[in-house]
Amino acid sequence: MLDTLLPFKRHFLSRNGNKLHYINEGQGEPVVMVHGNPSWSFYYRNLVSALKDTHQCIVPDHIGCGLSDKPDDSGYDYTLKNRIDDLEALLDSLNVKENITLVVHDWGGMIGMGYAARYPERIKRLVILNTGAFHLPDTKPLPLALWICRNTLLGTVLVRGFNAFSSIASYVGVKRQPMSKYIREAYVAPFNSWANRISTLRFVQDIPLKPGDRNYQLVSDIAASLPKFAKVPTLICWGLQDFVFDKHFLVKWREHMPHAQVHEFADCGHYILEDASDEVITHIKHFMTETETLATQVNPADSITEFESASQAPQAER
């Protein structure tokens, strides 16, 4: 069934003794899609299918996720920096170093924008889907469920013993209608044992909340880099019923990316590419076509002015 739902060739990159799985479909300018937690490259399957005839679609599974290896702590240090290093190594191995359309979701925002902060000149467009690339907004407390997973033995038992994080997310992450049995099973399938759920837990434990926490300075540095991208053509599609990446995060993105095209989906949750797949993919394809047309018609120095005019046109809000 998985081969039917994810009909792409498997590719693997060796990373310090671990195999990192990635999708690499199509030819043309690269579209790099970075997933979060507790999902995997499966999240982007429909977008890959929609774009692979015209673009090179690259979708890694982070170590510990999807079809990548899932080593214990002795075999991999589950940190944000290592995630960014892995993404850089993958793109370097594919010689992908320019004209990147970067698509990010959940933790993928921090990882993807961490890469972008290192190489801002490589980024052509940004597509932002229910994610963050900055510290928890002052107006947003850490949800209790994440606090329990991050800080307690009970959280460890629930996440690694009962797959609570991945399983529950497959239910509450969509709002329009439930995932089908087969789609839900595909989301949770890689996390099928205590050992194979290590990444799901380590991601939550890696959330920095205060100075001195691991990754706190790195997140600060990534956030500080965002002004470099204020004039990069940006599309934001946002499910407003996400209990983690909610309107507080969207407000921060609007501040950082004042020229972005923004589409809000009032009846959608965290997994917006499941809740509103056809609509979001249509927005992405239109955005890419529109910005490509502008890039070929106007002086690059003036392209943001043209893009601003387009992005400020009336938007249909759902």
From Swiss-Prot:
<dbReference type="GO" id="GO:0016020">
    <property type="term" value="C:membrane"/>
</dbReference>
<comment type="function">
    <text>Involved in olefin biosynthesis. Catalyzes the elimination of carbon dioxide from beta-lactones to form the final olefin product. The S.oneidensis oleABCD genes produce 3,6,9,12,15,19,22,25,28-hentriacontanonaene, which may aid the cells in adapting to a sudden drop in temperature.</text>
</comment>
<dbReference type="InterPro" id="IPR000639">
    <property type="entry name" value="Epox_hydrolase-like"/>
</dbReference>
<feature type="domain" description="AB hydrolase-1">
    <location>
        <begin position="30"/>
        <end position="275"/>
    </location>
</feature>
<dbReference type="Pfam" id="PF00561">
    <property type="entry name" value="Abhydrolase_1"/>
</dbReference>
<dbReference type="InterPro" id="IPR000073">
    <property type="entry name" value="AB_hydrolase_1"/>
</dbReference>
<comment type="similarity">
    <text>Belongs to the AB hydrolase superfamily.</text>
</comment>
<dbReference type="GO" id="GO:0016829">
    <property type="term" value="F:lyase activity"/>
</dbReference>
<dbReference type="InterPro" id="IPR029058">
    <property type="entry name" value="AB_hydrolase_fold"/>
</dbReference>
<keyword id="KW-0456">Lyase</keyword>
<protein>
    <recommendedName>
        <fullName>Cis-3-alkyl-4-alkyloxetan-2-one decarboxylase</fullName>
        <ecNumber>4.1.1.114</ecNumber>
    </recommendedName>
</protein>
<dbReference type="InterPro" id="IPR050266">
    <property type="entry name" value="AB_hydrolase_sf"/>
</dbReference>
